[in-house]
């Protein structure tokens, strides 16, 4: 067992979500949209469906680019330090997102952050994603490992997955991960994930 992710989906009766703040948190207002992808695969800049984001990116950065939160009334705000699972739609494509409130107070969904984006060969063609370093689907496994080695990053292979991260302390907080479909081509990336906290 290398990683555990635990969540309680039942809210206790006496649970206090904290004070709801109407203000847009500083962490959201200070977010800057990148102007270009970086040269390094671990750069936080990601191109997703034609728009640039720097992960973690606030939900408001997505809505500014035409994404619409589905059923927002079901989860109008998220408790301080909490997580919500939402669907957002753009170009008739609905994507499931995990969003995190990085502040102490409860806040609106738009003020929460997306930490992870992914894209796979089985997704519709209208969904596109590119990592910094111009990396996308079809990336060669050996070349990815070589690029990581040149930067001094750690490459870890586990079954059909390759995870690359800067150092052992960032293994679950900042990484890029690739899945290789051995039934098609075990050397070409069939999915790409970027995760930055």
List each model region and its residues.
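A cross-family detector of function-defining hotspots
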Residues: 2-26, 31-32, 61-107, 136-188
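A motif-centric signal for short, conserved binding hotspots located
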Residues: 109-113
